Amino acid sequence: MENMEKVVYLDNAATTACAPEVLAVMVEALSGACGNPSSHYSVGYEAKEFVDAGRAQVAKAINASPAEIFFTGCGSEADNWAVKGSAFTKARQNKKHLITSAFEHHAIMHSMAALERLGFEVTYIKPTAEGYIRPEDVEAAIRPDTALVSIMMANNEIGTIQPINEIAAIAHKHGVWMHTDAVQAVGAIPVDVKELGVDMLSMSAHKFNGPKGMGALYCKKGVWPQNLIDGGSQEARHRAGTENVAGIAGMGKALEIATTHLGERMAHEQQLRDYVIDRILKNIPEARLNGGVEHRLPGNVNISFPGLEGETILLDLDMHGICASTGSACNSDSLDPSHVLLSIGVPEEIGHGSMRFTFGPQNTMEEAKYLCDVLEEVIPRRRAMSCMWLQGQNKARQFSLKGEQ
């Protein structure tokens, strides 16, 4: 088997390359709009036009008003602002209880932990074995002092999509604010804040072929989480700091492109996803898919290969020119098992052998087939050298022999 001549990038959940049209508008903003968008003269007005245009594009993509879009430095900042800002606002009403899931992104998990250290209480909802949050479990956890429910729209590791509209309706029935981390969803599947019924929604530009270091928080009119960054009057006095004009322009353009061709993109990515899942589960013994298929991001594949370490597979794939991951890029330096996989009941030893492959619009069926070719060669070869795999096979044979006696 020969390596492909180009790098095969299959880690689109970690980040994506800027689209050419995005780079073009960013260069235009950087070179032609040198003023401060808060300044009241012509050069400042030119910069503000880029900010206003980007805000309008983001708002249109999720069916919001431009006045409901607040730009941040990243998706993690948007998550921190939604969670901590809501907690601090509601604490003034003696509401110091929050609800989230046990498999959120670390931006949510660590924000919740920080609030717990300040005396807040947090309930962590356990997902089902297929990776879904049951709305009835959320309702059962709501208390009179509940300030916020924060459940991610789509999981960043296993790609499962949550029933956010049902959960939001339950939260509102009890007078509770609802936030969703939609960083993996925006630009990948349809996102309509009115249909979802959420009060706050986080997004990140580099997940949909926009620039890194650029995010946004949607806040429904009348919902104001307390500021985390104080200073000037930018972002309607809710998030201080001179705006990243080029970043905002790039984010708006990227989301406009992503949502314009969303149906085609989803169908294409799902075709690649399903091909890889079907072929790997058929041809590699004991490979297991993590997360359900019915409500799953179209480009997400997360598969465990028992008897191996994910880092070993990762190195082999890299030698064949394939970029993938063992889980969230935000936690890639840790050798601890994925909290996402543990939360859905994947045993620790199997979770260590999990790989995430995430497709984007630029990927091809040729690349999907090449990935399967490489895995079908690498996994058996590595297992033949794996003490963990061989010991497991010996135990299985011994159990089988005992059953025949």
Per-region residue spans from a language model:
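Pyridoxal 5′-phosphate
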Residues: 1-405
